[in-house]
Amino acid sequence: MMMMTKMFVQIAVVCLLATMAVVSAHEGHHHHAPAPAPGPASSSTVVSATNMFTVLAIAAVALVVGSNH
């Protein structure tokens, strides 16, 4: 059971880092694109931020559950 928890945490951390890298790379390309239309934030930015926090929360829960067993 401990091995599965460790593997799950490692996968969650890798997903978090990959998402952060993709968001950082995407934000770096904004200076080449034309100015966005005024209005609310794009949904892709919101979804990326939500995904990062979700993966971080899942990793934290997995760490807590793993440390209690």
UniProtKB/Swiss-Prot annotation:
Residues 1-25 form the signal peptide. Residues 43-69 form a propeptide. The keyword Transferase does not apply. Coiled coil: none annotated. It comes from the Eukaryota. Glycans are attached at residues 34, 36, 38, 40. It is found in: Cell membrane. A lipid is attached at residue 42 (GPI-anchor amidated serine). The modification 4-hydroxyproline is found at residues 34, 36, 38, 40. GO terms for cellular component: plasma membrane; side of membrane. Keywords: Cell membrane, Glycoprotein, GPI-anchor, Hydroxylation, Lipoprotein, Membrane, Proteoglycan, Signal. The keyword Chaperone does not apply. It is a lipid-anchor; GPI-anchor. Contains 4-hydroxyproline; hydroxylated on Pro-34, Pro-36, Pro-38 and Pro-40. Belongs to the AG-peptide AGP family. Proteoglycan that seems to be implicated in diverse developmental roles such as differentiation, cell-cell recognition, embryogenesis and programmed cell death. This is Arabinogalactan protein 24. It comes from Arabidopsis thaliana.
